[in-house]
Amino acid sequence: MAESMVTDPIYLDETAKANGAKLDLLNATMLGVSASLGVLAKAQTGIFEEMDYNAIKAVVDAGSAPITFPTGTQLVNTYTGKDGKAYDCPWDVVQPDDTAEGESGATVPAMVLQMHYATLYDLQFSAYQAFYVVPDGGLVAGTYNVKMGLNWGNNVKTDAVYQFTLTKAAPAGARLTGFYNAPDVVPANWKVYVYKDQQKSELLETCSVTAGSAGTNLGTFLAKENGDLNGLHPVGYGDNRWWKSAYRQYLNSDAAAGAWWQPQDKWDMKPDQADTLPGFLSGFSDDFKSALSRVKVVTYGNGVTDDGSAVVTYDKIFLPSLQEIYCSPQVSGEGSYWPYWKERTGAKTPQALWQTYPLRITRDLAQRTVGRFVRLRSANRGSGYGAFVVYSSGLVGTWGGISALRSAPACKITKLA
């Protein structure tokens, strides 16, 4: 039976403002701090006040967050875009009564906040990954071929062999990329690209690909890494694993454009936006950045390019998982559900994947009537390239790692250093 649709969200902007007005008085009485602990009203000057993060941490550490900051409360700070324009940036209290584990293993009370609106800029979860690392001694000019060891989509067929010709030698450490979107692009349009390094500092050559087995065989493509070749899934559509994602690096950095990305393994390639986007945290105040702690985040692999087991990262900012936003996960263990999403959707049980839920639409920070695709960190367990997203329509599905999308990231407020 189809789940009945809830059309009125639990937390309207008006509700959050009303809750905030009540909390202002309560917080001022209890803590003697600014009314900025609740939902903030815009000042006549157009400046949005910053929150007293030390006071908030004290409330959380005392175990009083569920009373002081009930689920759905909005705490507002300021985000400044790369053009210098400032936006009020509400954070929803999605779980006031949580715990967080730090890198030392210490566990403390925590309150989970999630951005109410989508981030300002599109970013790839992962770039197209390299398929071959040029070994010491380089590759001489000449013809090379690869064999397909899998069926994938309409155009990748087992035992088919394709060749390409280097017109000049490729130096040691260069990366070969290509076969982009291979299952959905006819082989006649495939290319191989030779980059000097993983930073893509120089494109040395672009080669056409044709059917044929002339020259030196470099190996056989499988979905996963095989011999000297990377898996065709991340080569063709990007990698879907949170631990090595460009998105993770972006969200956790305040470095300038061109300075926040580093390769996470030998196949990783720089995303297209890395040279033009500064790190996400660069848009926030020093006070907010100082209030953030690296906390344990658990994310499972995909079961295709790896064994699908859990990987632990320690992140200040992280993308939500399916489980955390009250959707039915493909594997349990990527955090616990956040009551905000249960109450916002009105769902009685975790919502099914591949269905559309209008109350899940996340709108743009700058254009607040415009819905955006927002990334989750959960990998599609059945592929080495697709990660889950919530579409601009509210559909919960997957999208290739190479697609540049927005997000509504989260953080945990704790006393951890």
Spans of features found by a protein language model:
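Short, low-complexity N-terminal tether/leader segments at secretion or assembly junctions of large
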Residues: 1-31
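Collagenous Gly-X-Y triple-helix signature in extracellular proteins
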Residues: 32-132, 136, 149-153, 165, ...
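A short tyrosine-centered beta-strand micro-motif
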Residues: 144-146
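Short beta-strands within extracellular/lumenal beta-sheet-rich domains
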Residues: 160-164
